[in-house]
Swiss-Prot record:
Name of the molecule in the record: Glutamyl-tRNA(Gln) amidotransferase subunit A
Keyword Ligase: yes
Gene field: gatA
Any GO molecular function: glutaminyl-tRNA synthase (glutamine-hydrolyzing) activity
Pfam families assigned to the protein according to its UniProt record, in alphabetical order: Amidase
Gene3D superfamilies (alphabetical): Amidase signature (AS) domain (3.90.1300.10)
Active site (catalytic residues): K78, S158, S182
Subunit: Heterotrimer of A, B and C subunits.
Reaction equations catalysed: L-glutamyl-tRNA(Gln) + L-glutamine + ATP + H2O = L-glutaminyl-tRNA(Gln) + L-glutamate + ADP + phosphate + H(+)
Family: Belongs to the amidase family. GatA subfamily.
EC code(s) of this entry: 6.3.5.7
Protein purpose: Allows the formation of correctly charged Gln-tRNA(Gln) through the transamidation of misacylated Glu-tRNA(Gln) in organisms which lack glutaminyl-tRNA synthetase. The reaction takes place in the presence of glutamine and ATP through an activated gamma-phospho-Glu-tRNA(Gln).
Length: 493
């Protein structure tokens, strides 16, 4: 029998319904795995007592035929979703001991379906990073190793703890957030399915804000079917979020395995020109095109002429919004406060923020403050917003001809911890292919599609029209089926 912690969400639900095992046994299997691999630093707060209590309640519900969709399913939560009574820090010293008095809407939605929380996962501080190396709790280590080198690799970021937890079988699924690629890129690096729904599909209420016009909850799973199950539980209109979309949550599970007949897939191959993409990634892209063509899809050449400006636009708009959002951390109402005798209020602000924020967060606050200053706003911020509109228009034009768009998730496989740490510009380019869809607020997923020559997982990205998570899942499922001969599991776990 498969080890309990290696079951997918769908398999776990089936096993619990059939009384093959109890939720308590399932939770204990995950707790054992978490204890065994603490060296990965995937979790920053463990909630084992609560998990076992929730599991006991789930087992009672199964016994009384009252089981809900996710009854007894253990999951992990990125540490920027507020969890009532459970420490929530965004992995920043400025919030290191903050305990919320309310629950985020997304976590509440999962609890309402019977989910069991194992703990809060590590992340880049305030979700600012692509390698999970800016956390105040230290780096997350990927469970994957290259076949020619035993060096520790990054799991991707900013949701690296969630990615490492699911990849190393320390959670059946894990919540992440995706602002410019923070679910999709780690999913690519760790051999997982990572899904970011349409902006507004999942409530942002109770999420610690980075860039409000871009932030969106996402999910890590080990299968496309699991993604559809979790998304159905997570999504929904919320009056507490002014950006929430009042649209019916679709039935998504029927997308899995459905026919690709009459599907048109757009491929912007011009984005791969210029030697930006590693050879293995380019080969995977072409192999996936052939896979979809053989499955019955029509491949259409498209262009996204303004996508090349995505990174530049993102690093104007996102830091500008971050500078505004993070101004609330002043040491007065909650979080860290640095105090000295005879200090003024301004000095307290300065010392608290200097001590509480890490270097990358400070860099982005300074950049955001600069582009919002009166003499720079026209030249940078307003211009970036105009180009953002052009990026969205490019997608609209493409979707007039196709049902979905296919491109790589990241330009490379996972890299060594510290390799790109000293050059922010090179680090920012990790999100080269994920940022454009975020700027347009589109649903997208990363699905494992191949291995590099060094044995590391590579992900393909599928982008859909607004509110069309169904077709994204359909294409992702077809790719998953086409590469089922490849084992996307880290060795030794």
């Amino acid at each position: 029998m498969t080890e309990l912690n290696k079951l997918t969400v769908a398999e776990s639900v089936k096993g619990l319904k059939n009384k093959d095992f109890t939720s308590k046994e399932l939770v204990n299997a995950y707790i054992k795995q978490i204890e065994k691999y603490k060296n990965l630093n995937a979790y920053v707060t463990e909630t084992f007592d609560l998990a076992l209590k929730q599991a006991e309640a789930a087992d009672q519900n199964y016994g009384q035929n009252k089981a809900r969709t996710l009854e007894g399913i253990p999951f992990a939560v990125k540490d920027l979703f507020c969890t009532k009574g459970i420490r929530t820090t965004a992995c920043s010293n400025i919030l290191k001991n903050f305990i919320p008095h309310y629950e985020s809407s997304v976590t509440q939605n999962i609890f309402d379906k019977g989910g069991v929380i194992l703990g809060k996962t590590n992340m880049d501080e305030f979700a600012m990073g692509s390698a999970n190396i800016t956390s105040c709790f230290g780096n997350v280590i990927s469970p994957w190793k290259a076949n020619d080198d035993n060096s520790d690799l990054v799991p991707g970021g900013s949701s690296g703890g969630s990615a490492a937890a699911v990849s190393a079988f320390m959670a059946s699924a894990a919540l992440g957030s995706d602002t410019g690629g923070s679910v999709r890129q780690p999913a690519s690096f760790t051999g997982l399915v990572g899904f970011k729904p349409t902006y507004g599909r999942c409530s942002r209420y109770g999420m610690v804000s980075f860039a409000s016009s871009l932030d969106q909850a996402g999910i890590f799973t080990r299968s496309v079917l699991d993604s559809s199950i979790m998304l159905e539980a997570m999504m929904g209109f919320d009056e507490k979020d002014s950006t929430s979309i009042n649209a019916q949550v679709p039935e998504l599970q029927s997308a899995i395995g459905s026919s690709m007949k009459n599907m048109k897939i757009g491929v912007p191959l011009s984005l791969g020109e210029g030697g930006i993409i590693e050879h293995d990634i380019m080969k995977m892209w072409h192999d996936t095109i052939e896979l979809l063509k053989n499955a019955g899809a029509e491949i259409v050449d498209i262009t996204l002429p303004h996508a090349k400006y995505g990174v530049a636009v993102y690093y104007v708009i996102a830091p500008a919004e971050a500078a505004s959002n993070l101004s609330r951390y002043d040491g007065v109402r909650y979080g860290l406060r640095v105090e000295c005798e005879n200090m003024t209020l301004d000095e307290m602000y300065e010392m608290t923020r200097s001590a509480g924020f890490g270097e990358e967060v400070k860099r982005r606050i300074m950049l955001g403050t600069y582009v919002l200053s009166s003499h720079c706003m026209d030249a940078y911020y307003f211009k970036a917003q105009k180009v953002r509109r052009l990026v969205a228009n490019d997608f609209n034009n493409a979707f007039a001809k196709v049902n979905a768009i296919l491109l790589p998730t990241a330009p490379s496989a996972a890299f060594k911890i510290g390799k790109k740490q000293n050059d922010p510009t090179i680090m920012y380019l990790n999100d080269l292919f994920t940022i454009p869809a975020s700027l347009a607020g589109l649903p997208c997923a990363s699905v494992p599609a191949g291995l590099s020559a060094r044995g590391l997982p590579l992900g393909m990205q599928i982008i859909g029209k607004q509110l069309d998570e169904y077709n994204v899942l359909k294409v992702a499922s077809t790719i998953e089926t086409g590469v089922k001969h490849i084992k996307f599991e880290p060795a030794g776990f």
